[in-house]
Amino acid sequence: MDLSNRTVVQVVVLALVAQVTLSQHWSYGWLPGGKRSVGELEATIKMMDTGGVVALPEETSAHVSERLRPYDVILKKWMPHK
């Protein structure tokens, strides 16, 4: 009886592992492995009409530097030679 229970568990685990390893996640516009086709990316850039450059507003970049300021203090405390 122990051997049959063990066999059933092994078959179930094998089936689950096979399903996970053989299945692929597909999203609209994305290729397997998380790669996008170049044509779709170019179309997206043209639709945005930015020429491929996205500029951040000045307020956002200032806010980011303010958020990173405590890390600068920590780095100077622990690595004063830099």
Curated annotation (Swiss-Prot):
Q: Which residues form the signal peptide?
A: 1-23
Q: Which InterPro entries match?
A: GnRH, Gonadoliberin
Keywords (alphabetical) are:
Amidation, Cleavage on pair of basic residues, Hormone, Pyrrolidone carboxylic acid, Secreted, Signal
Q: Which residues carry this modification: Pyrrolidone carboxylic acid?
A: 24
What is this protein's tissue specificity according to the annotation? Brain.
> Residue positions of the PTM Glycine amide?
33
Name the major location.
secreted
UniProt GO cellular component terms? extracellular space
* MF (Gene Ontology): gonadotropin hormone-releasing hormone activity; gonadotropin-releasing hormone receptor binding
Where it sits in the cell: the answer is: Secreted
Hey, which family's this protein in? Belongs to the GnRH family.
Looking up PANTHER family in the UniProt record yields: GONADOLIBERIN (PTHR10522), PROGONADOLIBERIN-2 (PTHR10522:SF6)
What does this gene product do? Stimulates the secretion of gonadotropins.
Q: What is this protein called?
A: Progonadoliberin-3
Classification from the root reads: Eukaryota, Metazoa, Chordata, Craniata, Vertebrata
Q: Which gene encodes it?
A: gnrh3
